[in-house]
């Protein structure tokens, strides 16, 4: 990165020196140089809001060309734009202006190349995940999974990157699902010091729904972690894995003791979320044949999936709202 700054803080602007000079600005300016192509997610967000209203909770971006993400280190990713919720393991912050939003936007999801996803959104293709499960995890990162337990320094529930559930965490508890899109697994206690993962990545668990503001704390069943397990907490969800260790029971009160209660509570929290599905093409190119139809199929199925995965407690809208 090459730039110049007047000192003492102030605004910062990225430029394309070849195309945008001369320019008059009041703060620092710079241009970023790289040895390989990348995606400017904030530029995508700003471009979107130049034509559409600031009336979206999530922007969900798909690329119509091959592109590695984060140097090949991610299949898809999410980054938070704004958080005002307390008691979910996240700081309070607002970076909306950088994304072109002055109010509602909370999350940016980068799904990567559309071509790497199966045409059938319910086909399992990435470990135990379908396209809908991947989308469930990435949009779910707006709230999940960052909870500590017992006290604010205990990450026993957490696995990969401290933002997914621990493989050894029975993330569904006694709930109706087979694990959580946020990882962890549905674990059977064999009663002899061994445990077996019996299901995984199946929508949102009761604990997830509590964190999302869709379920009161009183409706979250007890859960447990297999303490001392030989399985890496960051391991990808899998079915049929045997673990050995001690059962450590967890209640929602143990989590609230560490994080405090969720504010706003489920009684006052948002239940309907608007998400924009965005297809990005290379400059000057039309979408690939079939891409728009494929993405629209995903969009339509996602609205159904989200409602099902939240046990009918949450709703997604995907309509476009012009400025």
Predicted regions: what they are:
Residues 1-135, 139, 235-323:
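Zn2+-dependent metallopeptidase catalytic core
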Residues 150-151, 219-223, 285-288:
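Substrate-binding/catalytic groove segments of enzymes
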Residues 56-63, 146, 222-228:
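Surface-exposed patches in mature extracellular/periplasmic domains of secreted proteins
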Residues 203, 215-247:
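Short linear, low-complexity motifs centered on an aromatic residue
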Residues 1-4, 12, 108, 207-210, ...:
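A broad "ordered helical/assembly scaffold" signature
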Residues 74, 212, 225-228, 289-291:
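General "foldedness" signal
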Residues 128-214, 221:
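The catalytic-center signature of Zn2+-dependent metalloproteases
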